[in-house]
């Protein structure tokens, strides 16, 4: 699949009908993000199991607990903060740029719950082109930049802000690991969900 996207042409007649091929790589990017392995075919877990050994890192998780992120060059996840757990990310194909910001930077990143997504707090700042006249404190934000290459694993601490962009056609998997103080954060998220759904 990754080779197919990189060449911008189908490798088999079956893939010709894949929706990504309706768009030109130079002007569009495609992102299959946040896809839970358990919801995909069982083949995904079988293929990933020997590659992604979360238990070797001390986690009580296996490949079926993972989430898949597959995208073309330029695909990205906007700057956000996960509200609970820590994040382990394994880069399997291609490269991804990560911009990480400490939770201490929250005031500089202008957090918002719009759009609402359970367990995510977004930043109003577009880190690719920050508008410092609207968000002046964003000029003070100090990111840590990391480029993940195949075989790399990144540990994202709890509540750290992150922006992620594929530098090439990219495949990565991640797993969220619970922390002892997640119960309180999950309760806050449940309250936020009730409030948001009551407004709909």
Q: Can you describe what each PLM-predicted range is?
A:
Residues 1-153, 161-200:
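N-terminal accessory scaffold of Fe(II)-dependent oxygenases
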């Amino acid at each position: 699949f990754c080779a197919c996207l990189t060449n911008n042409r189908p490798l088999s007649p079956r893939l010709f009908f894949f929706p990504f091929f309706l768009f030109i790589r130079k002007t569009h990017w495609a992102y299959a993000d946040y896809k839970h392995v358990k919801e995909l075919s069982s083949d995904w877990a079988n293929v990933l199991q020997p590659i992604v050994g979360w238990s070797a890192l001390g986690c009580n998780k296996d490949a079926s607990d993972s989430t898949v992120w597959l995208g073309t060059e330029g695909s990205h996840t906007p700057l956000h903060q996960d509200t609970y757990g820590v994040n382990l990310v394994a880069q399997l194909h291609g490269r991804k740029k990560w911009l990480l910001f400490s939770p201490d930077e929250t005031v500089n990143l202008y957090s918002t719950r719009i759009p609402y997504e359970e367990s995510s707090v977004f930043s109003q700042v577009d880190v690719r082109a920050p508008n410092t006249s609207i968000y002046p404190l964003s000029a003070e934000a100090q990111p840590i930049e990391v480029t993940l290459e195949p075989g790399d694993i990144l540990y994202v601490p709890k509540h750290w802000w992150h922006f992620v962009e594929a530098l090439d056609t990219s495949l990565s998997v991640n797993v969220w690991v619970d922390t002892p103080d997640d119960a309180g954060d999950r309760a806050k998220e449940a309250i936020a969900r009730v409030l948001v759904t009551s407004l709909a």
